[in-house]
Amino acid sequence: MTPNSENKPRVIIPRSFYDRPAPQVAPQLVGCRLVRIYNGRRLAGLITETEAYQGEEDLACHARVGLTPRTEPMYGPPGHAYIYFTYGMHWLLNAVTDKEGVPAAVLIRGL
């Protein structure tokens, strides 16, 4: 992901950026560009909406039930992707945030 601003250089956001609680990271991702190179083609879009999920006490968070095979990525190192399939038709992308061992992630809700 790269910041999207006319007066800021376009750089890859370092993993250290994600080493904070999800509610702090989520609004700062809005306006960033998500880029992927796929089969030699550059695919990109601007992040327009995010949602923060923070810890087992967050009842909307997958980790509310604790550590399971499905939620294990949320407990991992910040800056990694947590991707899952839902409703039998959608793949959802999240950026893992906070310290390793703390289940937190930001859902990329709009691109």
Regions found by a protein language model. Name each.
Residues 2-111:
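A cross-family signal for N-terminal binding/gating loops and helix N-caps
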